[in-house]
């Protein structure tokens, strides 16, 4: 199923691609066991899995929950992705924050307690260059103990100065591991190259990132197939990038500009089962839960195996402090076009997708304490690298 689609550029000898293309016929023993854990289960079986998952999470991570916030730098993008609000041909309000505006957004997050931030941007080298990204990281490094980036895939040597500036984690989602569906979803732009994206985590590891985050966007393909491929990818990275901490995110599609309708669904029960299956199969891998999910579901899932949560999120550049409103525009074939409204004071850039859990970070922290979990705003000190 995964092999019958375009390959893109040449595959490196150490690529995950050959392993992926052997699915579903060839699976490791670990992944076969994982596949059994995501098969339809009775209530009693699922409760037993949940109990096991909770115990393993407590054993490996303690009674803690890392909290982070995404900081969107730009919603410019040269890719056309059918499901994404930032897709190039969507007539949305766009902006790329200037450095002082990025700092203002970051200081707002720091004032709320965050010391872990994820810098996010659409893929557009004209607006989000490696130099711009390094400058943003360097400007925030003093106030944030952990800076992660989620941007378009880059070459190893392009990541090196970003790491040197202070970034310690790279996040890149394959979106879907089904090559055919991937080709259908990504109609133009460099993101069409499946293998280039697939091997991005390894390039980041070779550049010096100490944390690597991957994931699939559930709703593009059958969730069980995505989960098996994701498990194979986790197992591969645990061996190939053995000095890095590996984490996995399990986002489900949310409404966004363009009004894409997912062809596949994943129920709350199935999401809970997947979290438990991942925790039992990979006890030391981090599991991330975003504000895509509604508050009541996030509250129910925090004790199952999740180790990291976003809180109080905005998915539009400048969303926390209304930065960049004076520079809002449309982008048409690389050209900046003025919007039709007068001024930008009452407008914000368009977000990537709709948020479901809009509770304030302090409210999330109090909820966690009520569940016997300690919210962790900071769990890493860059100075340790120099000691």
Where are these regions (language model features)?
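Auxiliary Fe-S-binding modules of radical SAM enzymes
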Residues: 1-44, 239-387
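Canonical Radical SAM [4Fe-4S] cluster-binding loop centered on the CxxxCxxC motif
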Residues: 59-101
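Core AdoMet radical
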Residues: 88-105, 109-205, 210-220, 242-249
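Short, charged low-complexity linear segments at domain edges
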Residues: 45-66
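Generic structural signal for well-ordered alpha-helices
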Residues: 69, 106, 133-137, 159, ...
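Conserved, mostly hydrophobic/aromatic
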Residues: 53, 81, 119, 172, ...
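Short, small-residue-enriched loops and turns at beta-alpha junctions
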Residues: 75, 123-128, 218-223, 256-257, ...
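Catalytic cores of alpha/beta
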Residues: 155-164, 210, 221-236, 294-304
């Amino acid at each position: 199923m995964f092999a019958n689609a375009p390959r893109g550029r040449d595959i490196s000898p150490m690529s995950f691609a050959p392993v992926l293309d052997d699915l579903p016929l060839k699976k490791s023993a670990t992944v076969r066991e994982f596949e059994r854990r995501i098969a339809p289960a009775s209530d009693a079986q699922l409760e037993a899995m949940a109990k096991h998952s909770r115990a393993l999470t407590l054993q490996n991570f303690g009674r803690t929950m890392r909290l982070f916030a995404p900081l969107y730098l730009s919603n410019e993008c040269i890719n056309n992705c059918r499901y994404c609000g930032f897709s190039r041909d969507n007539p949305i309000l766009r902006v790329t924050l200037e450095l002082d505006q990025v700092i203002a957004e970051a200081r707002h997050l720091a004032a709320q307690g965050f010391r872990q931030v994820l810098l996010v941007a659409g893929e557009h080298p004209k607006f989000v260059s490696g130099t711009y990204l390094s400058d943003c990281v360097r400007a925030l490094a003093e106030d944030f103990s952990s800076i992660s980036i989620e941007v378009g895939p880059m070459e190893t040597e392009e990541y090196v100065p970003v790491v040197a500036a202070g970034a310690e984690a790279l996040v890149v989602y394959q979106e879907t591991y089904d090559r055919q569906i991937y080709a259908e979803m990504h109609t133009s732009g460099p993101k069409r190259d499946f293998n280039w994206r697939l091997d991005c985590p390894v390039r980041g590891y070779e550049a010096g990132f100490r944390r690597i985050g991957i994931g699939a966007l559930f709703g593009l393909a059958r969730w069980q197939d995505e989960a098996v491929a994701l498990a194979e990818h986790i197992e591969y990275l645990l061996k190939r990038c053995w000095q890095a901490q590996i984490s996995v995110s399990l986002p489900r599609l949310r409404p966004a500009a363009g009004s894409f309708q997912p062809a596949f669904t994943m129920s709350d029960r199935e999401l809970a089962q997947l979290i438990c299956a991942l925790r039992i199969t990979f006890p030391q891998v981090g599991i991330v839960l975003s504000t895509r999910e509604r508050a009541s579901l996030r509250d129910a899932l925090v004790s199952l195996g999740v180790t990291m949560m976003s809180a109080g999120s905005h998915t539009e550049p400048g969303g926390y402090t209304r930065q960049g409103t004076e520079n809002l525009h449309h982008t048409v074939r690389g050209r900046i076009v003025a919007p039709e409204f007068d001024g930008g004071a009452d407008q914000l850039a368009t977000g990537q997708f709709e948020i479901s859990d809009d509770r304030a970070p302090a409210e999330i922290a109090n909820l966690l304490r009520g569940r016997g979990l300690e919210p962790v705003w900071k769990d890493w000190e860059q100075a340790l690298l120099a000691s």
